[in-house]
Design a protein with these regions (language model features):
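P-loop NTP-binding module
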Residues: 1-193
Length: 193
């Protein structure tokens, strides 16, 4: 099965899911893949602040409420094949918008125009938005920050994703603290001195 729509989520805030989403999108665009990033973190988006000088750009929430068209909310990046749809203004009902038919239609249309649609969603450990979106997509990538997530919490988030029917494509382990080198440092030190 082809993978086109991919959700990127985490267990908690500040684990690097937005940065991971943007880096993956840039890498795919550099491979001449047409990529759309949708910022579906309508509750606490940071993507617009990092990627545009426009103040409060229209985005996903305006599209899903019918206030503007998709075309008006696509922002071109420095990469020819990479576009971003920002979250837009905070709506009173993000889960309702993401679980509705308009969002499903948006994904279907995006799949026709792009090779990959990467969807940045809120942390699944905080709200249910990620599971709602994951149920509509081809797969999910879970970003886990080293020493920030307890094992039990990670397992609970993975279970929520499985219950949503989402295929877990993989885990990105982020913010790994560089250690002393462990076993391999000792091995090479003894072997090559």
């Amino acid at each position: 099965q082809d993978i086109c729509t991919v959700v990127i989520t985490s267990c908690n805030e500040n684990e690097g899911k937005t940065t991971t989403t943007l880096q993956l999108a840039k890498s795919l665009a550099e491979l001449d893949k047409r990529v759309l990033v949708i910022d579906a973190d309508m509750r606490k988006s940071v993507m617009a602040g990092r990627n545009t000088t426009a103040e409060n750009p229209a985005g996903l929430s305006e599209v899903l409420t019918g206030l503007t068209s998709v075309k008006e909310c696509l922002y071109q990046t420095q990469y020819e094949d990479l576009s971003i749809m920002f979250a837009g203004k905070y709506p009173p009902n993000p889960v309702e918008l993401l679980s509705g038919q308009y969002f499903e239609d948006l994904l279907k249309t995006a799949k026709e125009s792009y090779d990959y649609v990467l969807i940045d969603v809120p942390p699944l450990g905080s709200v249910i938005d990620a599971a709602v979106v994951a149920a509509k997509c081809d797969g999910t990538i879970l970003v886990i920050s080293d020493n920030q997530v307890r094992y039990r919490q990670a397992i609970e988030v993975i279970e929520q994703l499985r219950k949503s029917g989402s295929k877990i494509l993989g885990v990105v382990r982020n913010n790994i603290k560089k250690k002393d080198g462990g076993y391999y440092k000792k091995y090479y030190k003894n072997r090559y001195q």
